[in-house]
């Protein structure tokens, strides 16, 4: 069966597989953090906005940090434990406002996709 609405693809695109692409040491909070890995899938370091994937090894904790922008992420695998004790699991979506201060740790390991953005215009 054909679809008469199909058009041929035009323009650039980038496809990244989260499981096949090498990760880099995580450094979005300034210094490199051991056992935390970053995959830049659309993050603009100059503007500090865009998409990324973070993989945390079991037993790892992030450095305490404050969010300058909105940060949102979705847990894809494992669990993440927030500094207030909240346990985030696969499928949980989290949204932080600018000025939020926390750190996170994982006992199981964790894979998440995140997005940092400027506030929406009102």
Give residue spans per PLM region.
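Conserved short histidine dyad/triad with adjacent acidic residue
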Residues: 37-67, 97-101
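Structural motif
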Residues: 49-53, 73, 110-111
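Short glycine/proline-enriched turns and hinge-like loops at secondary-structure junctions
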Residues: 66-68, 86-87, 106-108
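A short, N-terminal "cap"/entry segment at the start of jelly-roll beta-barrel domains
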Residues: 1-47
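Glycine- and acidic-residue-biased ligand/ion/polar-headgroup-sensing regions
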Residues: 58, 67-83
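Ligand-binding loop in jelly-roll beta-barrel domains
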Residues: 34, 98-122
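Short acidic-glycine-tyrosine-enriched beta hairpin
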Residues: 82-102
């Amino acid at each position: 069966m054909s679809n008469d609405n199909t058009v041929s693809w035009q323009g650039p695109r980038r496809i990244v597989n989260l499981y096949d692409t090498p990760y880099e040491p995580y450094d979005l909070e300034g210094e490199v953090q051991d056992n935390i890995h970053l995959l830049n899938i659309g993050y603009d370091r100059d503007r500090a906005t865009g998409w990324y994937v973070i993989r945390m090894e079991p037993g790892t904790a992030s450095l305490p940090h404050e969010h300058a922008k909105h940060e949102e992420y979705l847990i894809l695998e494992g669990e993440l434990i927030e500094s207030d004790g909240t346990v985030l699991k696969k499928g949980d979506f989290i949204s932080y406002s600018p000025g939020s201060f926390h750190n996170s740790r994982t006992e199981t390991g964790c894979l998440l996709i995140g997005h940092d953005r400027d506030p929406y215009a009102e």
